[in-house]
């Protein structure tokens, strides 16, 4: 699934163009938009590549997906209950845990429980403002520094420009109003 297809899927799912770009910007930072991405620091520890891990979880030969602590997928889901929910969502859909469309659907489903975040993504007209909300209230990485905020908003802005064909410059990229 291309970046543009992901963008269009999220817009069709109810996000504004800015909101879709913001969410994909965060996924770019987390996984490089690779839905089969196993957290790099766990590949050696678990003895798996992105593909072998995905296949082992899908076929049931690896049963510790929920609790192994490894980030996985577009959002690098890590916490055990979120990974269990992702796995269950994939199973119910009859899809691989690494299926990008399933993961985007899961993200939209999961975001419905984050009222402030989903509202920001549906109504966003500013990349930076919505990006900070996603960072602080949904992704919640350990590093929420200004440098990280600017970088993630920058990814969102680049994706917005590529996917819409506009060359919008975010005036508030470096400072939050």
Q: What residue ranges belong to the model's regions?
A:
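Solvent-exposed, non-transmembrane amphipathic alpha-helical segments
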Residues: 26, 43-47, 150, 154
């Amino acid at each position: 699934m291309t970046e543009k297809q992901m963008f269009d899927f999220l817009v069709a799912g109810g996000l504004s163009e800015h909101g879709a770009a913001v969410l994909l910007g965060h996924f770019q930072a987390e996984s490089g938009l690779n839905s089969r991405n196993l957290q790099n620091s766990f590949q050696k520890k678990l003895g798996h590549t992105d593909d072998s891990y995905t296949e082992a979880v899908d076929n049931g030969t690896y049963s510790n997906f929920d609790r192994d602590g490894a980030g996985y997928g577009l959002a690098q889901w890590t916490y055990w209950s979120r990974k269990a929910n992702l796995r269950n969502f994939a199973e119910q859909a009859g899809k691989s845990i690494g299926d990008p469309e399933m993961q985007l659907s899961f993200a939209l489903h999961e975001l419905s429980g984050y009222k402030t975040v989903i509202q920001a993504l549906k109504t966003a007209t500013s990349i930076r403002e919505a990006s900070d909300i996603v960072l602080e209230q949904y992704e919640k990485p350990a590093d929420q520094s200004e440098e990280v905020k600017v970088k993630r908003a920058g990814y969102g802005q680049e994706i917005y420009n590529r996917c819409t064909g506009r060359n919008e410059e975010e005036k508030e990229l470096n400072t939050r109003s």
